């Protein structure tokens, strides 16, 4: 039995496929989805969404969003995300530089300015996920 996964963004439909397994970057903890999973709605953190298709993992870098898992005759996963980024191996150095800049920005933010601190924290989290995606592809 497989999992039907659909990914959408605010600009429209992005991707649909049948998967063997899915690893979601849930806001509480990484969430592994297998066929027959219980019904659940979860928030997604910026991170690496991994989809196993034909015994190979496909990494997808996402920003925040939500996922709904519904199981009846089959397991269906609908993922709504704000942004998605294609991972290209030649951009690894750029990803490391962006992470360094995000760390620097977080260190110079006024600790009293909560909005700026949250924004800088999200940028750092996304930059860390980008570097993680490149390392994932290298293995």
From Swiss-Prot:
A GO-annotated cellular component: proton-transporting ATP synthase complex
Membrane topology of the entry: Peripheral membrane protein
Gene3D superfamilies assigned: F0F1 ATP synthase delta/epsilon subunit, N-terminal
Record keywords: ATP synthesis, CF(1), Chloroplast, Hydrogen ion transport, Ion transport, Membrane, Plastid, Thylakoid, Transport
Keyword Transmembrane helix (UniProt): no
InterPro entries recorded: ATP_synth_F1_dsu/esu, ATP_synth_F1_dsu/esu_N, ATPsynth_dsu/esu_N
Any GO molecular function: ATP binding
Cellular localisation: Plastid, Chloroplast thylakoid membrane
Pfam families listed in its UniProt record: ATP-synt_DE_N (PF02823)
Family note: Belongs to the ATPase epsilon chain family.
Record's subunit section: F-type ATPases have 2 components, CF(1) - the catalytic core - and CF(0) - the membrane proton channel. CF(1) has five subunits: alpha(3), beta(3), gamma(1), delta(1), epsilon(1). CF(0) has three main subunits: a, b and c.
Function field: Produces ATP from ADP in the presence of a proton gradient across the membrane.
HAMAP family: ATP_synth_epsil_bac (MF_00530)
Protein name listed in UniProt: ATP synthase epsilon chain, chloroplastic
Organism: Dictyota dichotoma
Gene it is expressed from: atpE
